[in-house]
Amino acid sequence: MTTIVSVRRNGHVVIGGDGQVTLGNTVMKGNAKKVRRLYNNKVIAGFAGGTADAFTLFELFERKLEMHQGHLTKAAVELAKDWRTDRMLRKLEALLAVADETASLIITGNGDVVQPEDDLIAIGSGGPYAQSAARALLENTELGARDIVEKSLSIAGDICIYTNRFQTIEELTY
């Protein structure tokens, strides 16, 4: 799996991910980029799960963003509906973390679109470790969103065997 973390603080939203790709119990690649910009660089997104599945979902999500003129929540709900009801899409195994200047969302194949209360997202095998670290840093420091994401990913990379310390980080300022 992987670790994807998103933090929103002081006019910045950041999504970061590690770079490890595994096949069974073998590391196949250590520098995969699981976070990217979409819709004219106005949306950032990260994935946990199957790489090919995630690329398919990124393409579909970008189409939904274009259909809904960049409205993140509408595009996310439409993607989740298609993902849940389409026979072929239902087989895709991934989770998406997406964010723009207004919202941070988790999109699942079960048709769920979740906006966390504190705008903190952590998904993938290292998600619980990264979430714990990020929450502690949010509550007890004045660190910026990017620093919190970097430190949370590093901690998850030290603990989770399916997460490494290579990081891809994207940030939006609003």
Curated annotation (Swiss-Prot):
List the SUPFAM superfamilies hit by this protein, alphabetically: N-terminal nucleophile aminohydrolases (Ntn hydrolases) (SSF56235)
Question: A Gene Ontology CC term for this entry?
Answer: HslUV protease complex
Ordered alphabetically, the record's keywords are:
Allosteric enzyme, Cytoplasm, Hydrolase, Metal-binding, Protease, Sodium, Stress response, Threonine protease
Q: Which GO terms describe its molecular function?
A: metal ion binding; threonine-type endopeptidase activity
Protein name according to UniProt:
ATP-dependent protease subunit HslV
One Gene Ontology biological process: proteolysis involved in protein catabolic process
Family in the record: Belongs to the peptidase T1B family. HslV subfamily.
In the UniProt record, does the keyword Hydrolase occur?
Answer: yes
InterPro entries for this protein: ATP-dep_Prtase_HsIV_su (IPR022281), Ntn_hydrolases_N (IPR029055), Proteasome_sua/b (IPR001353), Proteasome_suB-type (IPR023333)
Tell me how this protein assembles: A double ring-shaped homohexamer of HslV is capped on each side by a ring-shaped HslU homohexamer. The assembly of the HslU/HslV complex is dependent on binding of ATP.
Active site (record annotation): T2
Species this protein is from: Yersinia enterocolitica serotype O:8 / biotype 1B (strain NCTC 13174 / 8081)
**Which top EC class is named for this enzyme in its record?**
hydrolase
State the protein's purpose: Protease subunit of a proteasome-like degradation complex believed to be a general protein degrading machinery.
User: Can you tell which superkingdom this protein's organism belongs to?
Assistant: Bacteria
* Compartments it resides in: Cytoplasm
> How is this protein's activity controlled?
Allosterically activated by HslU binding.
Q: List ligand-binding residues for Na(+).
A: G157, C160, T163
What EC number(s) are associated with this protein in UniProt? 3.4.25.2
Q: Which reaction does it catalyse?
A: ATP-dependent cleavage of peptide bonds with broad specificity
